[in-house]
Amino acid sequence: MVDKIIFTVTPIFSIPPRGAVAVETWMYQVAQRTNFPNRIVCIKNPGYSNYTFVNDNCSIHRVGFSRIYKRLFQKWTRLDPLPYSQRILNIAHDFPITKESVIVVHNSMKLYTQIRKRAPQARVVIHMHNAFEPKLLEQNVKMIVPSLYLKKYYQSYLANADIEIVPRLAP
């Protein structure tokens, strides 16, 4: 039984999005309707606060990177001392998560792999909204997909994966 969820996505758009951003919009809609405690962790774009209270069960935590940090650690040296994946885990640790808590990574195999490496004991699920070749995923991955097509697609690569279909319903 799941008692808490951390929703996260690639560090491109802040949540709630100010434009047509399907994955981020879907995640925001689901998180605010979920009946148990959850957190959304996303990147902090200009004009957004670090934290937003949504309701009693949901809040948004935005991770910011300074221009100097991005330039020095992410572009020049590629030696990122506190990457996005670790910042997500720090927020999860402050939640505090339990053995029943789940981190749901949306549409990013790279981010999923980074979180798994940094927290192998954590219950991490990847929610794939698109068909990408799963080169970075382990064979026994736990995955959520929105369609039978995607379930069959990923099962053709990952025979031992635990894949569940959760259809996308219009908010």
Locate predicted features:
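Nucleotide-activated donor-dependent transferases that construct or modify glycoconjugates
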Residues: 2-20, 24
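Structural motif
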Residues: 4, 101-102, 142
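Short His-centered aromatic/hydrophobic patch
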Residues: 84-85, 104-110, 128
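An amphipathic, basic-hydrophobic alpha-helix
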Residues: 70-102
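Short loop/helix-cap segments at secondary-structure boundaries that form the rim of catalytic
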Residues: 48-55, 112-119, 132-140, 154-157
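N-terminal strand-loop element at the rim of the active site
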Residues: 9-17, 33-76
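Donor nucleotide-sugar binding/catalytic pocket of nucleotide-sugar-dependent glycosyltransferases
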Residues: 133, 140-171
